[in-house]
Every structure is written in structure tokens, then in C-alpha cells.
Curated annotation (Swiss-Prot):
MF-aspect GO terms: rRNA binding; structural constituent of ribosome
Gene: rplI
Matches recorded under PANTHER family: 50S RIBOSOMAL PROTEIN L9
Species for this entry: Granulibacter bethesdensis (strain ATCC BAA-1260 / CGDNIH1)
Keyword Ribonucleoprotein carried by entry: yes
Pfam families assigned: Ribosomal_L9_C, Ribosomal_L9_N
Protein name: Large ribosomal subunit protein bL9
Transmembrane recorded as keyword: no
Example GO biological process: translation
Length: 191
């Protein structure tokens, strides 16, 4: 199929800035750009109308961006805790998706929807994970997601302590290092 020409109404990551004339596949235009209000078809009438409204659209975009920057500044360093069941190795029974993260962030006081969460893949292990929340196409807020089995475990993870098998392995490695040093110095360790 032939590519579709569109005029972007806002910045779209990896595609272009507001006002750019872009060529995209029909499905991308039909399913993402057009219904989301991110672009309009590049007909002669739409091009003329866009040029007439360009200043107004840029002013609206600037206002939305400034509001998003204020919100990002107010909640910078945001960290949310998500409690999930997990096995001994730290693998979750299930996963944490963008929907779960959006609910946790909304409960902490910042209203977001799951489409604003940029998550490369679902979280399937306990621990801290950094995700991006897109408040505006030009404003991205980093959020730390702390996935743990309990609130106490989440607090330990937030302090940087290892949990689960990782904690046991760290303790065993520390003990092995202590024994190795003691052997080198020929000191007896009593258990």
C-alpha cells in the first residue's frame, strides 16, 4: 500500500515536530495518529486551515507543555510501591504492566493513564525499575517502580539492600570473602 501524507499537530517521538509533513504507513495513520488527534491528512484544505491556526496551536501546545513541566517539577523523584507475590528467586507470579503502574501513580496523587507509561517490557522480577511517564510529548517524568512482596521488603529495597535469593547470595559471598581473607592471614574464625 502507498504511504499516507499527514501534517503533525504535535511532536511525535521518532517521527517529527508539530507542522511537519510526514509520510507514514496507512495503519499507523488510521490506528494511532489520526484518532489520537496527533495529525491530520495533508489535503490542500487541511494545509491551509493548519497554516491559519498554526499560531493558536503553538500557543496551546506551549501552555500544555508549561503545565506538564510544573507537574513534573512538583512530583520529581516520584517512587511507587507495587506489592506482588513472587517465588524464592524473585520471579513474579504474573507481571507488572503499564496499567498496574498507572494505577499506583494515580493513587500517589498524579493522574495518569496507561498510555502515558513507557515500559519496554512488563516487569517480571522483584526490585527497582525506572519507567518513563510522558506528561507531554516534550516532557517525560522518570518514576521509580519498587516491586516487592511486602511493604517491609519494599523499604529494604529502597534503602539498597538486597532481598530474596540475592540477599542470601550476597551474604554467602561476603562470608566466603571473609573466610578467604582469614585463610590468607591464617586466622581461625569461630562460627
Amino acid at each position: 500500500m502507498a504511504a499516507v501524507e499527514l501534517i503533525l499537530l504535535q511532536r511525535v517521538e521518532k517521527l517529527g515536530q508539530m507542522g511537519d509533513l510526514v509520510r507514514v504507513k496507512p495503519g499507523y495513520a488510521r490506528n494511532f495518529l489520526l484518532p489520537g488527534g496527533r495529525a491530520i491528512r495533508a489535503t490542500k484544505a487541511n494545509t491551509e486551515r493548519f497554516e491559519q491556526q498554526r499560531a493558536q496551536l503553538e500557543a496551546q501546545n506551549l501552555k500544555r507543555r508549561e503545565e506538564a513541566e510544573r507537574i513534573a517539577e512538583r512530583v520529581s523523584g516520584l517512587s511507587v510501591v507495587i506489592i506482588r507475590q513472587a517465588g524464592e528467586s524473585g520471579g513474579l507470579y504474573g507481571s507488572v504492566s503499564s496499567r498496574d503502574i498507572a494505577v499506583a501513580i494515580t493513587e500517589s496523587g498524579l493522574s495518569v493513564n496507561r498510555q502515558q507509561i513507557q515500559l519496554d517490557q512488563p516487569i517480571k522480577m522483584l526490585g527497582l525499575t525506572d519507567v518513563r511517564v510522558v506528561l507531554h510529548p516534550e516532557v517525560v517524568l522518570p518514576v521509580t517502580v519498587n516491586v516487592a512482596r511486602s511493604v517491609e521488603e519494599a523499604e529494604r529495597q529502597a534503602r539498597g539492600e538486597a532481598v530474596g535469593l540475592a540477599a542470601e547470595e550476597a551474604a554467602a559471598a561476603a562470608e566466603a570473602a571473609l573466610i578467604e581473607v582469614a585463610d590468607e592471614e591464617e586466622v581461625e574464625i569461630s562460627a
